[in-house]
Amino acid sequence: METFLFTSESVNEGHPDKLCDQVSDAILDACLEQDPESKVACETCTKTNMVMVFGEITTKATVDYEKIVRDTCRGIGFTSADVGLDADNCKVLVNIEQQSPDIAQGVHGHLTKKPEEIGAGDQGHMFGYATDETPELMPLTHVWATKLGAKLTEVRKNKTCPWLRPDGKTQVTVEYKNDNGAMVPIRVHTVLISTQHDETVTNDQIAQDLKEHVIKPVIPSQYLDENTIFHLNPSGRFVIGGPHGDAGLTGRKIIIDTYGGWGAHGGGAFSGKDPTKVDRSGAYIVRQAAKSVVASGLARRCIVQVSYAIGVAEPLSVFVDTYKTGTIPDKDILTLIKENFDFRPGMMSINLDLLRGGNFRYQKTAAYGHFGRDDPDFSWETVKVLKPKA
């Protein structure tokens, strides 16, 4: 049997880049909660003892940026300089301006355009992907890498492993076979976890706890064998972490946010962007389209691309490929997609309820992936049943 290895990585919520994603989306939530028409392009960067938010925001909302930054960092677990950042005493810098009037008139006509007329906030192309290898219709390498990161955070916060600190990374390599275009996982080849820890714990204790409390609950035992390789804190020491260890920036974990290297990516990040930014809304609707194709039994694996021009409502192109796993021709699947999904930015916002912020709606997306999540706030995960015409 011919097989191949494929690897996906993830980082947990204490990684500096992910901290920035969460701050940017917490600010988006605050704006949309009070003013659903808010136009938000919010970036965040961080380094030792400092978090800065900057970008363009036009909103009627009253937003306490500094409080949001501190609350978000505290919620992650950055409560002292020892762990990488002190939420209550770090410097918070804010440099927010209004959206460019040139962009505003071209995209939404200074809020005068009807929803179906609202243009894309920028040019670009986005991809959605789905595969039948997991119940979430997501790649297994990505699902496990992501769940390992989430489990690391869980056992840190519930004090199962009190030596853990917020920063951490995971990576999973799976051996697959190609079944006529569909991906079939056979076994786990390698599990890699690098997690920040305190000064007291030994490397042996780290390895033992990670196997027992993180890997065992996430990866079913039938995928692990005597040849599975475990790299558990292979560098030997990871005490300094978070923004103290590395600078962080919004939008630097776009593969972790999506499909773990499977499918394709148009390059646009998600966090800190309101739904007129098709980098985000376009990627969400093509995930819904690809997932619906697979869930409807039309293919075992599917990728969908959409592209836009700034200020233009209708997409420039829509593309589908089922990797030769389709039960009907790809051109017929494309027709079904175009008939069942409205790719105009204003209509995507309505149909996917993307103008609703608050209650951590967008902040939740900013750690542990935007896709494959079982949460009603992730409206783009809702399947539309697609039926070919008889």
Swiss-Prot record:
K(+) binds at residue 43. It comes from Nicotiana tabacum. Belongs to the AdoMet synthase family. Keywords: ATP-binding, Cobalt, Cytoplasm, Magnesium, Metal-binding, Nucleotide-binding, One-carbon metabolism, Potassium, Transferase. InterPro entries: ADOMET_SYNTHASE_CS (IPR022631), S-AdoMet_synt_C (IPR022630), S-AdoMet_synt_central (IPR022629), S-AdoMet_synt_N (IPR022628), S-AdoMet_synthetase (IPR002133), S-AdoMet_synthetase_sfam (IPR022636). Pathway: Amino-acid biosynthesis; S-adenosyl-L-methionine biosynthesis; S-adenosyl-L-methionine from L-methionine: step 1/1. One of its GO terms (molecular function) is ATP binding. PANTHER family: S-ADENOSYLMETHIONINE SYNTHETASE. It is found in: Cytoplasm. GO terms for cellular component: cytosol. Catalyzes the formation of S-adenosylmethionine from methionine and ATP. The reaction comprises two steps that are both catalyzed by the same enzyme: formation of S-adenosylmethionine (AdoMet) and triphosphate, and subsequent hydrolysis of the triphosphate. Binds 2 divalent ions per subunit. The metal ions interact primarily with the substrate. Can utilize magnesium, manganese or cobalt (in vitro). Its EC number is 2.5.1.6. Mg(2+) binds at residue 9. GO terms for biological process: one-carbon metabolic process; S-adenosylmethionine biosynthetic process. It catalyses: L-methionine + ATP + H2O = S-adenosyl-L-methionine + phosphate + diphosphate. L-methionine binds at residues 56, 99, 246, 277. This is S-adenosylmethionine synthase 1. Pfam families: S-AdoMet_synt_C, S-AdoMet_synt_M, S-AdoMet_synt_N. It comes from the Eukaryota.
